[in-house]
């Protein structure tokens, strides 16, 4: 990886773009620049969030025009403070997993990817990582992945598969009002592509739906709780030690937590400090 521009030259280019689209010129502070020649991607690390906002511009116009001008496939703009936060979360996750006494294949591989991400905090790329790091899959199923068909749970299943957990995906099916047919099509396509086992569990959420429509409570908490209970019970019944959820909030010390009967919950995206990006 090499730098395409100096900080000064890049700041000049940014302000030229800002001027062209009617934005005022600003003093922009860039902490660091990383260019991935293979992917033709540029990372701009700013000193603070206002600098990040200045580079992105209203509606993303500045960074979009900058990408076109520099003929770059993709430009990522992050503030240095955000990376410090991410680094801190990753270190906490690594500490938590290092203290988790387990010889599970998937857990050991998760520790490896955590270390690699800490070493390449600015420019870590999952596609490139898994192209050059192919992990042996566990002979036994080590994890159940709660798969809703949405982005977070789908990403969790992909990660679990590539990390060697030999996962089985389980989808709670309360009917089309909660699980539309489009999500079922997404689920089938993904599990087929990954060659991952998958099961549906029929569930009755009618009371939760009825009471929420009557305004008695917000459905998310109760729906989520009931889903977790069903997923956990499936794992216990099948002697599978880990349940994986696509939670992105339970980072660091909460990335893996004990449940009932020796079961553990792993919030896989959160353990890797993955955000909505």
Language-model segments: residues:
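N-terminal presequence-like segments and adjacent domain-start helices
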Residues: 1-13
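Short edge beta-strands and adjacent turn/loop segments
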Residues: 19-45
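A short interface-forming secondary-structure element
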Residues: 39-61
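A conserved beta-strand->alpha-helix junction
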Residues: 57, 184-216, 247
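A short amphipathic beta-strand at an alpha->beta junction
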Residues: 67-89
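A short, basic/flexible loop-to-alpha-helix module at the beginning of a structural domain
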Residues: 110-141
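ATP-dependent adenylation/pyrophosphate-handling site
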Residues: 134-188
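Active-site adenylate/phosphate-handling loop in enzymes that bind or generate adenylated species
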Residues: 208, 214-277
